[in-house]
Amino acid sequence: MSKTLNWGILGAGAIAKTFAKGVARTTGGKVIAIGSRSQGKADLFGDELGIARRYGSYEALLADAEVEAVYIATPHPEHAEWAIKTAEAKKHLLCEKPIGMNFGEAMAIVEAARDNDVFLMEAFMYRCHPQTQKLVELVKQKAIGDVRLIQATFGFRMPFDPKQRIWANELGGGGILDVGCYPVSMVRLIAGAATGRDFADPISVCGAGHLHPITRADEYAIASLQFAGGIVATVATSVGLEQENVVRIYGTEGYIFVPNPWLPGSDGLDTKILIYSNGQPEPREIAVETPNWLYAIEADTVAAHIDLRQAPSPAMSWDDTLGNMKTLDQWRQAIGLTYDAEKPENVPTVHRKPLAVQARGPKNNMKHGSIAGVTPPVSRLVMGVDNETFSPVVAVLWDDFFEHGGNCFDTAFVYDSGRCEKALGDWVRARKIRSQVVILSKGGHTPECFPGPISRQHRESLDRLQTDYADLYMLHRDNPAVPVGEFVDVLNEHVKSGTMKAIGVSNWSLPRVQAFNDWAKKNGKTGLAAISHQLSLARMIAPPWSGCLSANDPEMLGWLAQTQTPLMPWSSQGRGFFLPSTSAENHADAELVRCWHREDNFRRLERARELAKKKKVLPINIALAFVLHRPFPTFALIGPRTIHEIRSSLRALDVELTEAEMRWLNLED
């Protein structure tokens, strides 16, 4: 990179002009190109701001080899597509806030920056200003004691126009995404500073708001956020209502008032923070010197940290951005705001290309195996569908898994009262890939583990999944009081009708599994194609849920090896036990402690860490590879919440373990 950072700008609107004027006041940057949807707009922009290279398309600007960094100033719904394309063009990027329409798009943008080794920052310019740095310092120094309550507001009134960006549904209109993202980012920053971190994500988000009756954009909205450490916050935003755009931070010894939090020193003027201490009649004024125009400071922040690929706090790091977008999603969901483009049938791929499995290679290292009765070869990693249901988020996750060769999805009748099944069915239907995926459906969970409810649940699951059949159907629990033949009969009825292609059981004891197969064989019925029990390198010492069983005992493992019955193990990575934060001293996660903390497991963890260093992977990759290298077919269930976690899991497929390494990891040496 040259000494002067050469900028290109995508989008020729008002914010693009403001940024270009800011760059002109920097010492290390220069705008050399403008890209617009039309040549005419690019020419007008270039004439006004003295920019020689004017492109009538965004693609043309990205093809300019001398453009090193790109400021994305397009409308919200276009951020993801062009941020990803910018990263793929190997150019650093500063993306206008919000970085995407939702957490799903934000994940994809961050992963594109990571994949292509480029700088990325979300353009909250106030986070780069010295005033924000001073505010963080005051909180850390306990200038008002312990922080208890934070209030932040950003709102304005714009006359309603359904075609205007502020109000249009198709352009992501409304207060939360336009300016509500500012107070959310501020209270998360302050809550983090008060608890010794760069930022904090809320434990809970409750919200209320008013949606415009025509476009359903949020006209005004508020939210209450609860953080660790006893900190609560309120945020408010609007595009149809004037508000007092300030920040107040209340502590045990006073409060801080920030009169101009969002545009501090925008034209280079100094700014101030006021501290009201308990018992003092007048506030203490903290003057903050502004070294340059606000947007110049932002551009210089990018240039100064290009080599790090992220800027340090209080600027927006990647994780900070992801946490902010997650919180904005929660706020919007609390007030019932889902944009038309986010409805299941409308969600596009984040890169705006047709969904397709990548060719075998670095972007697709998936391995597949066979399960009797299931037609497509089954991916050795199975996507757990048991948590997130917001359409634009699950679409990004599942698209990424599918593009990397993953085709098996595990869900159940009881997960989130059926919403998980519905979300999966919506995605498969919208993407038109039913014949290309394997759906593992489960029913018969306690207390309805009887033959009668199983048929009813199966029919309801098919309706939610919007399909005529389950590729593999499993009983979620066992009921030993029911003769095994009754379960064999009811499942075989559905096999005969074609609504179950193959059948299995989850969390059954070995004697009951054997009895099922024996009864089926004796009576000419279909037996078990696979089973699903817990299995991981770390031994489960207590089940996370009632009625769960592990396959990690000599008899079950021996039977699996002898019969070559496929195992689809859940909690295959020990539910986070192999993450860097795990230690015998860390009791923050009570469930992790209850289910996994034991001396022998910590020895396995240390060995996984040692072998991971040798093989240049992560300990969690070693743990998953251990499950995939068993002497019987395994199809490991994983539960990634982010694209990055998907990519991390995929690395395990390339890890080779010798028999000696397997024994050593399991303390059998």
Report the location of each language-model feature.
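C-terminal helix-rich "cap/oligomerization" subdomain common to oxidoreductases
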Residues: 1, 69-71, 304-365
